[in-house]
């Protein structure tokens, strides 16, 4: 039978209470010893710091410099102190090393005539629709009677009109397309363009180059980019010297 409120139970509880109290007392004693040890270590460290400070040599007071005399003063002209406004940044593009591709890539591009650029996708169409607005200053056309200069804007560029060209350039796929130009007089002009696509074997990414031509089949502007999945990077407005990597 279980023993409840008997002498043995009371005695056991008293012994347990005494043991707990003894443990608490020992714990307090240990804490006091640790605090004393900590104070002793702090005092020793402060004493060592003071001894080290006493060993550091004191700085020697230097004599104050005499004020400059008028003979030593030199008038500096504005040409020597002003920044030369004709200085320009280096035309050499900044490069960054791509560990995945194992080569350096340019991270700079500068097109002063570029005023606005945007792209959007229409969800209701089967083929993606890209709209871009790029201001491009055309070459002035002159005659014996007048000189005329126009500013054109690319307003529409669709992928539904792409067709493969018979000509190939360095193993790249060539697609013929067109883009629309809104002139200042309100007329719309349809001009040719070519898209060069080449796949890189190391990672499957695509080198894409867009070449825009005028009505005389002269190259107007080049845009190159690297497409890897849904990511587009290394966009450069290259000009006439744009070439795909062979």
Swiss-Prot record:
Residues 130-149 have a biased composition (Low complexity). It comes from Caenorhabditis elegans. It comes from the Eukaryota. This is Uncharacterized protein ZK637.12. Residues 120-149 are annotated as: Disordered.
């Amino acid at each position: 039978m279980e023993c409840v409120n008997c002498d043995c139970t009371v005695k056991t509880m008293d012994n347990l209470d005494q043991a707990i109290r003894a443990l608490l007392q020992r714990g307090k004693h240990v804490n006091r010893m640790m605090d004393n040890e900590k104070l002793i270590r702090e005092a020793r460290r402060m004493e060592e710091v003071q001894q080290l400070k006493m060993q550091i040599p004191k700085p020697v007071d230097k004599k104050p410099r005499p004020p400059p005399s008028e003979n030593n003063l030199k008038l500096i002209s504005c040409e020597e102190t002003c920044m030369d406004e004709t200085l320009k940044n280096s035309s050499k593009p900044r490069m960054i090393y791509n560990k995945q591709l194992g080569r350096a890539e340019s991270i700079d591009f500068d097109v002063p005539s570029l005023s606005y650029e945007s792209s959007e996708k229409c969800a209701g169409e089967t083929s993606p629709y890209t709209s871009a607005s790029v201001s491009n200053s055309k070459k002035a056309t002159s005659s014996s009677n007048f000189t005329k200069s126009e500013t054109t804007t690319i307003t529409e560029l669709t992928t539904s009109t792409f067709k493969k060209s018979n000509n190939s350039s360095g193993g790249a796929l060539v697609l013929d397309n067109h883009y629309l130009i809104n002139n200042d007089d309100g007329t719309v002009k349809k001009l040719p363009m070519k898209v060069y696509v080449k796949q890189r074997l190391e990672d499957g990414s695509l080198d894409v180059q867009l070449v825009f031509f005028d009505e005389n089949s002269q190259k107007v502007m080049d845009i190159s980019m690297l497409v890897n999945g849904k990511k587009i990077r290394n966009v450069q407005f290259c000009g006439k010297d744009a070439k795909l990597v062979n």
